[in-house]
Amino acid sequence: MTQTIFMVGARGAGKTTIGKALAQALGYRFVDTDLFMQQTSQMTVAEVVESEGWDGFRLRESMALQAVTAPKTVIATGGGAVLSSENRAFMRDHGRVIYLRASAAVLAKRLAEDPEEAQRPSLTGKPIVEEMLDVLASREALYQDVAHHVLDGTQTPSLVVEQILQMLTGEMVK
């Protein structure tokens, strides 16, 4: 198997943590689209949103997704990458999509503990638990629609990676 693996889910779901571990287990390259955008634009996510608005950020996100897609690559997508129907079609057509699902309470707790959180702009201006409830309510169907596999992102990263490896091995046998 050499296809691209896309990790989708809300902020704090574990896409980067699990994506890195999965890439290491597979001998793949790992790319985080938010980090890629920051490196190529020389701006933080907050700075891109401030200067170009959310539409500009989403456009950059789509371009980054296409730019980093390559065989033997695990990609941690931005939480909102699924908002674009073009992004959803692109990911489904170019690899396997894994949705890391977690409750709003778990996501809020992880984000509150994340030192990078300060550079991520609020999507709604609400407290983080309320924001995550809103985000999940508006995106859950999109995450489900794009995903080839849905996994419980609240488990330990090693367990999630093990489950992904088993799923991918099972697909190769079919």
From Swiss-Prot:
<keyword id="KW-0028">Amino-acid biosynthesis</keyword>
<feature type="binding site">
    <location>
        <position position="139"/>
    </location>
    <ligand>
        <name>substrate</name>
    </ligand>
</feature>
<feature type="binding site">
    <location>
        <position position="16"/>
    </location>
    <ligand>
        <name>Mg(2+)</name>
    </ligand>
</feature>
<keyword id="KW-0963">Cytoplasm</keyword>
<feature type="region of interest" description="LID domain">
    <location>
        <begin position="112"/>
        <end position="126"/>
    </location>
</feature>
<keyword id="KW-0057">Aromatic amino acid biosynthesis</keyword>
<feature type="binding site">
    <location>
        <position position="155"/>
    </location>
    <ligand>
        <name>ATP</name>
    </ligand>
</feature>
<feature type="binding site">
    <location>
        <position position="34"/>
    </location>
    <ligand>
        <name>substrate</name>
    </ligand>
</feature>
<dbReference type="GO" id="GO:0000287">
    <property type="term" value="F:magnesium ion binding"/>
</dbReference>
<dbReference type="GO" id="GO:0008652">
    <property type="term" value="P:amino acid biosynthetic process"/>
</dbReference>
<dbReference type="InterPro" id="IPR031322">
    <property type="entry name" value="Shikimate/glucono_kinase"/>
</dbReference>
<dbReference type="GO" id="GO:0009423">
    <property type="term" value="P:chorismate biosynthetic process"/>
</dbReference>
<comment type="similarity">
    <text>Belongs to the shikimate kinase family. AroL subfamily.</text>
</comment>
<comment type="pathway">
    <text>Metabolic intermediate biosynthesis; chorismate biosynthesis; chorismate from D-erythrose 4-phosphate and phosphoenolpyruvate: step 5/7.</text>
</comment>
<dbReference type="GO" id="GO:0009073">
    <property type="term" value="P:aromatic amino acid family biosynthetic process"/>
</dbReference>
<feature type="binding site">
    <location>
        <position position="58"/>
    </location>
    <ligand>
        <name>substrate</name>
    </ligand>
</feature>
<keyword id="KW-0067">ATP-binding</keyword>
<dbReference type="InterPro" id="IPR027544">
    <property type="entry name" value="Shikimate_kinase_2"/>
</dbReference>
<keyword id="KW-0460">Magnesium</keyword>
<feature type="binding site">
    <location>
        <position position="79"/>
    </location>
    <ligand>
        <name>substrate</name>
    </ligand>
</feature>
<dbReference type="GO" id="GO:0005524">
    <property type="term" value="F:ATP binding"/>
</dbReference>
<feature type="binding site">
    <location>
        <position position="120"/>
    </location>
    <ligand>
        <name>ATP</name>
    </ligand>
</feature>
<dbReference type="GO" id="GO:0005829">
    <property type="term" value="C:cytosol"/>
</dbReference>
<keyword id="KW-0808">Transferase</keyword>
<dbReference type="InterPro" id="IPR000623">
    <property type="entry name" value="Shikimate_kinase/TSH1"/>
</dbReference>
<comment type="function">
    <text>Catalyzes the specific phosphorylation of the 3-hydroxyl group of shikimic acid using ATP as a cosubstrate.</text>
</comment>
<feature type="binding site">
    <location>
        <begin position="12"/>
        <end position="17"/>
    </location>
    <ligand>
        <name>ATP</name>
    </ligand>
</feature>
<dbReference type="InterPro" id="IPR023000">
    <property type="entry name" value="Shikimate_kinase_CS"/>
</dbReference>
<keyword id="KW-0479">Metal-binding</keyword>
<protein>
    <recommendedName>
        <fullName>Shikimate kinase 2</fullName>
        <ecNumber>2.7.1.71</ecNumber>
    </recommendedName>
</protein>
<dbReference type="GO" id="GO:0004765">
    <property type="term" value="F:shikimate kinase activity"/>
</dbReference>
<keyword id="KW-0547">Nucleotide-binding</keyword>
<comment type="subunit">
    <text>Monomer.</text>
</comment>
<dbReference type="Pfam" id="PF01202">
    <property type="entry name" value="SKI"/>
</dbReference>
<keyword id="KW-0418">Kinase</keyword>
<dbReference type="InterPro" id="IPR027417">
    <property type="entry name" value="P-loop_NTPase"/>
</dbReference>
<feature type="binding site">
    <location>
        <position position="32"/>
    </location>
    <ligand>
        <name>Mg(2+)</name>
    </ligand>
</feature>
